Amino acid sequence: MDISIISDRNNPLLQRREIKFTVSFDAATPSIKDVKMKLVAVLNANKQVLVVDTLDQIFGKLEAEGYAKIYNDEKAMATIETKSVLEKNKIEEEAEAEVAEE
């Protein structure tokens, strides 16, 4: 899975960075959690304040376009983001421990 950043914009009014990106992959479309962890590594960001808002498959290609936001702090994120977006970006600690062991 390869991620390329299309745009990276700072939005001081909402206390966040807004990132548009494309994801190239070989098989099925990766999950939001997989894309989030890859973005954390590529952007050197804190996983607690990074939110993948959308991930849309490009018809006929093994690519997807996405939109992510990196907030300055968790308080700003909780104030602005909806509960559904926060739930789909939630990462359980047990899952991370399993990945770290492998």
Swiss-Prot record:
Belongs to the eukaryotic ribosomal protein eS24 family. Signal peptide: none annotated. Keywords: Ribonucleoprotein, Ribosomal protein. The lineage of its organism: Archaea, Methanobacteriati, Methanobacteriota, Methanomada group, Methanococci. GO terms for cellular component: ribonucleoprotein complex; ribosome. It comes from Methanococcus maripaludis (strain DSM 14266 / JCM 13030 / NBRC 101832 / S2 / LL). SUPFAM superfamilies: Ribosomal proteins S24e, L23 and L15e (SSF54189). This is Small ribosomal subunit protein eS24. Transmembrane segments: none annotated. It holds the Pfam family Ribosomal_S24e. GO terms for biological process: translation. GO terms for molecular function: structural constituent of ribosome.
